[in-house]
Amino acid sequence: MAGGALGAGVVGVGVGTIFAGIARDAFQAEPAVDDGPDELLREPARAPERRQVRSADGTRLNVEVYGTDAADSDDVVVMVHGWTCNTAYWYPQINALAERTTVVAYDQRGHGRSERGRARPTVAMLGQDLDAVLDAVVGDGRRAVLVGHSMGGMTIMSWAAQYADKVPTTVSGVALTSTAAKAVLQNHTLIPMNLPRYTRPFEATVGKLFTSAPVPIPKTPYGGRLSHYIALGPNARKAHVDFVDDMIGACPHRSRAGWGAAMGKLDVTAGLEALTVPTTVIVGSDDRLTPTSHAEQMAEVLRRNGHLRDLVIYDGVGHMSSIEAAERFNELLADILAEVGSEKVPA
């Protein structure tokens, strides 16, 4: 009994020291730049066409189509958001692209307006959900450009691993943004490097608690400082920090925990190998959740296979790269569409 209590106490001290170090760095950092609202983050003026798409297990997914109908459009972009986000994550791209492009965004299961489903979340489910969406929105003989952020990039790779034969016939290009193919919880830079050495054995425990503890996130005046530290770059705009903090806070805690636990077993390298179309890898230099090492590893696999379009690193940008660097990101998407677009399936 005494030994167990002592062990628990040691763990508590180690874990507590790490969380205290994260909080210290978050609150000592420069506050976000308050330079007014970002018009790209506004809700799109034109309401989307909303569809309910059922995944393989019957879970209903909320799908939003902006712009012209996918069947009539020259370009179709399917956007897949990340962990704790929802379709609003893509507002900067929808607002910039939807007038001339069909933009499809959907809520991952358990996020936004999509059902959570009854089964325990798995990375394989993410790919199956994406397959159901693609079947519903990409017409026969058409191909789309897939854009995935964070868990959304993992979703694309999960889909490619399970449906490799569909990759060349369904997709003309891919953008993997601020994401990883494996070991995402083992390779991050959230924990300060200057903590006592005795905390090292408890870093994995902190990672699991951070991602998979099923507890609500209380709304406090200080939450934005933590969101800034965790998810955005050091010079982020306050409008971006507030937007991200509100979006994360809106994610149901059970979904956040379930998908956080699922990512603990992440390995979609088979899907990365199956991406046989031009693929762009994008990351911020200051991404703490999926550091540049992940992007470089993915880019090397794609380069070796002859399918790397480009590796793009945005200086000073954190994990929310397509919000923080929206103008540059939108220009990059426009370039990708100009090169590959939603081409017809090769004869």
Regions found by a protein language model. Give the residues of each.
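Conserved HGGG/HGGXW glycine-rich cap/lid loop of the alpha/beta-hydrolase fold
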Residues: T59-R116, V123
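Active-site loop/oxyanion-hole signature of alpha/beta-hydrolase fold enzymes
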Residues: H111-M154, Y163-V167, E331
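Conserved alpha/beta-hydrolase catalytic His-Asp/Glu region
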Residues: F210-G271
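Acidic catalytic loop of the alpha/beta-hydrolase fold
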Residues: M263, D286-T290
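Short beta-strand/loop motif that positions the catalytic acidic residue
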Residues: L275, V281-V283, D287
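Catalytic histidine-centered segment of alpha/beta-hydrolase-like enzymes
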Residues: L289, L311-L332
